[in-house]
A protein has these predicted regions:
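Short, solvent-exposed loop/turn segments at secondary-structure junctions
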Residues: 29, 125-127, 165-168
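Conserved active-site beta-strand-loop modules that form the wall/rim of enzyme catalytic pockets
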Residues: 107-109, 115-122, 157-163
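Short acidic (Asp/Glu) and glycine-rich catalytic loops that position anionic groups and cofactors
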Residues: 27-33, 122-124, 174-178
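An active-site-proximal "capping" alpha-helix that borders the catalytic cofactor pocket
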Residues: 137-149
Length: 193
């Protein structure tokens, strides 16, 4: 199958935030300048994925009470494919007469009690979040739900954002962490828009 364009949730996010930056990167091949990228969120992300994989298919202890009746999808090899943007979720959509390849990589995937699927994403913040961050992540989660649907994995209509933030620091240098789980409603239709 051939396609006219290849997009991902992050590329679409750039389009929404800065159309000129999107044009420069994708048409003129001039990348948007990146500031210093913090390594702490990437480190937390890696630790959390390792933790989830150690429990798979059971949820890690901190989520069992918050998400009763749910499990983690797949085995370690299967989820690692979904975590890689080259082998993750892929679909082709027809938009205004053009074929668009949509690709995305998930942090994890929750299997709901009814057998439907919910994207799960780990986020980090400097303090406990006051809101779910939907203004930043809603469209990304809608696109993941659309990609699940197009890959014959029925989306549940929910996505989970698990925010991790520092809570304490001890005199011997140990840092305590807390987490706050949010549920976003998702829509395949919004993902198409």
């Amino acid at each position: 199958m051939g396609f006219d364009f290849s997009l991902s949730p992050s590329k679409i996010g750039v389009l929404k935030d800065c159309p000129k930056c999107f044009y420069n990167a994708n048409v003129l091949k001039v990348d948007r300048p990146r500031g210093i990228f913090p390594s702490l969120p990437g480190g937390v992300d890696l630790v959390m994925k390792t933790c989830f994989d150690a429990f798979r298919p059971v949820l890690p202890a901190h989520l069992v009470k918050q998400l009763p009746g749910r499990t983690l999808w797949g085995n370690k090899d299967q989820i690692n494919k979904l975590r890689n943007w080259r082998s993750g979720l892929k679909t082709e959509l027809k938009i205004q007469g053009k074929t668009v390849s949509l690709i995305g990589a998930l942090d994890d995937l929750i299997v709901e009690a009814d057998g439907t699927f919910s994207p799960f994403d780990v986020k980090t913040k400097g303090k406990q979040p006051e809101t779910d961050g939907a203004e930043y992540y809603q469209h990304q989660m809608d696109l993941y739900s659309l990609m699940l649907f197009e890959n014959k994995m029925q989306p549940s209509g929910n996505a989970y954002l698990d925010y991790w933030f520092p809570t304490t620091f001890t005199d011997i240098g140990d840092m305590g962490w807390g987490d706050r789980l949010f549920t976003l409603d998702t829509s395949c239709q919004r993902g198409r828009e």
